[in-house]
Curated annotation (Swiss-Prot):
Source organism of the structure: Bos taurus
Main location class: cytoplasm
UniProt keyword annotation of Acetylation present: yes
SUPFAM superfamilies with a match to the protein in the record: alpha/beta-Hydrolases
Record protein name field: Protein NDRG2
Subunit structure: Interacts with CTNNB1.
Tagged with keyword Acetylation: yes
Length: 357
């Protein structure tokens, strides 16, 4: 497996006081389905997995994940893990447009590229963070390589193939809307699009004027042709690792994520529905997502000495108390966060805790 390119860059971003610029290395490797580009931050930590991210359609790793990984509270996490940001083929900055007739990889084939990345880096296990199409790719990878995935954070995942009604609606929309507008409707809620905030204007401009828009359309088509993941609770086709499902309240994929939650192992799955976050919680609510991710890592046995917010401390105390009563700490967790109410629900149906945050 040959390396095509390796360059060293310094991320351009506002720095926190006393923080030095992160050095990143961008690599490209050949796979059976073409070249894939990924960027590595940090150095491998002994006995710790890499954090590997995979972005959604219309985005690349920077536009999808930068606000989250640049968030102040996230710095404690990234100091403890090497991270690998994968760009889907043709989505990396400066990517040339694929020639006419190019056969873009399916989402299953994109998942099959990940072992080539890990082999090149000599990484054995990962914690995956995926959004939309990227969440599907990481889930497919976890199904075929369960021993290499320690945990998954899946934002806006839709594990189902498109049905006939979905296809009809998609084709009808395609007659009246541009590719960029259809992708925006996939990324953001109708309320957000109607409000036309600065965030929406920014991403509308990014997608509509992307020099690789033809490549983006190919990724979009692969997403719309995805196969059903066929998750079955209690069956062989399920995710074996701890999973945190995340979706914004009233987000385009809310129903799909709720359905996905119903199909996964309740002892391994947490469900976080975030209020006031829209379709892309990693962009609009990086603080809440960082806190949830930190707690997720602590549940996996990492960062036990990490500083915890009042919300996490209250939640830990409540769960410890509950565990001492029922003797079973492995159970489904549903987290519902609101900036107004600070309500946190956890555990079996009907078990609700009120905490301040």
């Amino acid at each position: 497996m040959a390396e095509l390119r390796e360059v060293q860059i310094t991320e351009e971003k506002p720095l926190l006081p006393g923080q030095t610029p992160e050095v990143a290395k961008t690599h490209s490797v050949e796979t059976p389905y073409g070249s894939v580009t990924f960027t590595v931050y940090g150095t491998p930590k002994p006995k710790r997995p890499a954090i590997l991210t995979y972005h959604d359609v219309g985005l690349n790793y920077k536009s999808c994940f930068q606000p989250l990984f640049q968030f102040a509270d996230m710095q404690e996490i990234i100091q403890n893990f090497v991270r690998v940001h994968v760009d889907a083929p043709g989505m990396e900055e400066g990517a040339p447009v694929f020639p006419l007739g190019y056969q873009y990889p399916s989402l299953d084939q994109l998942a099959d590229m990940i072992p080539c990345i890990l082999q090149y880096l000599n990484f054995s296990t990962i914690i995956g963070i995926g959004v939309g199409a990227g969440a599907y790719v990481l889930s497919r990878y976890a199904l075929t390589h369960p021993d290499t995935v320690e945990g998954l954070v899946l934002i806006n995942i839709d594990p189902n193939a498109k049905g006939w009604m979905d296809w009809a609606a998609h084709k009808l929309t395609g007659l009246t809307s541009s590719i960029s507008e259809m992708i925006l409707g996939h990324l953001f809620s109708q309320e957000e699009l109607s409000g036309n905030s600065e965030l929406i204007q920014k991403y509308r401009n990014i997608i509509a004027h992307a020099p690789n828009l033809d490549n983006i359309e190919l990724y979009w088509n692969s997403y719309n042709n995805r196969r059903d993941l066929n998750f079955v609770r209690g069956g062989d086709t399920t995710l074996k690792c701890p999973v945190m499902l995340v979706v914004g309240d009233q987000a385009p994929h809310e129903d799909a994520v709720v359905e996905c939650n119903s199909k996964l192992d309740p002892t391994q799955t947490s469900f976080l529905k975030m209020a006031d976050s829209g379709g892309q919680p990693q962009l609009t609510q990086p603080g809440k997502l960082t806190e949830a991710f930190k707690y997720f890592l602590q549940g996996m046995g990492y960062m036990a000495s990490s500083c915890m917010t009042r919300l996490s401390r209250s939640r830990t105390a409540s769960l410890t108390s509950a565990a001492s009563i029922d003797g079973n700490r492995s159970r489904s967790r549903t987290l519902s966060q609101s900036s107004e109410s600070g309500t946190l629900s956890s555990g079996p149906p009907g078990h609700t805790m009120e905490v301040s945050c």
